[in-house]
């Protein structure tokens, strides 16, 4: 019973079936948005108009289709596929390698009929033939008048390395799904923050108590006044508030600390600081008018003490100025930092408040995954090494010689013909 179960797990058809199931689940995870809020699913998958007649937000949440790659059943399929690979390696690949290492002598000349490449030699001595074979880097084993030769045995290890690398990748994926997390924070510059806004996390995840600070944030622009790159000066602090690590990050250049990555992902303008005629500094919030494309923020600043008249302020960049419009919507000028504008009452632009969007994530399985892919590439190179075998039987004045190879048949035929020439 035990042997039959293990052989069933090691069967190639079973492994392919599990792989197809995993691929189908991955397609579902690609089509359905992952790790979104319930409101998003209620909006896109309503109960009244079910997709395909059955798919709605309640079904998605019930079966965990909103986080497919972290569900117990998806991780179970991955574990089952890994178990199938491991069983196949133990029951099939290692025995095949063990057989390949043995001296597989041909005892009778009739066995040469099973080979596609064989010859009967009468004009070449055995010592000459063995010298040529040895010169071609073959290992030679001889018992009286029978000889067995092979080379490229390392090529037979490639399938084992493939299985090993895939098992490493699967273990890394499971470990990362169970212990990793992803968070998104929008932090005003000069502010310190903890990791709080968790977007997704695994069942065994422990959120690190890391204190960080955004020291500064700025944007560089192209000649066409479009955003070229945005930067955040980020510090990692210890429990006493002292700086441990500091780095200026930008898109695709994160700061790393204790296997936690801080990525630059977004930015926002949140307010204006204005000094009025009484030298008081007031802060006005900015509202974003667009969700995509060109970003524009707007606020309203009163120009009299009764709040009946005012100025509309527009900000569309972080180049240190804002645009001013009067009550009729007529453009009256730009106001730069530390510049004073006078319309009914003087106002001075003190600062444009910005915030940076940071994605904070950790994936403890990434090292295993990278190592697995490294071995996978190594196995690809090793698989190009041809495993070739040559058998020889000497009877009276005749020499029977034949050969076989796992790949590169044409090259082996040329080599074989040169050996017996």
From Swiss-Prot:
Q: Which InterPro entries match?
A: Cyt_c_bgen_Ccs1/CcsB/ResB, ResB-like_domain
Its main subcellular localisation, reduced to a broad class, is plastid
Q: What is this protein called?
A: Cytochrome c biogenesis protein Ccs1
Single Gene Ontology BP term? cytochrome complex assembly
Q: Which UniProt keywords apply?
A: Chloroplast, Cytochrome c-type biogenesis, Membrane, Plastid, Thylakoid, Transmembrane, Transmembrane helix
Q: What is the source species?
A: Trieres chinensis (Marine centric diatom)
Known function:
Required during biogenesis of c-type cytochromes (cytochrome c6 and cytochrome f) at the step of heme attachment.
Taxonomically, the superkingdom here is Eukaryota
The gene designation is ccs1
Family designation:
Belongs to the Ccs1/CcsB family.
What membrane topology does the annotation report for this chain?
Multi-pass membrane protein
Localization, UniProt: Plastid, Chloroplast thylakoid membrane
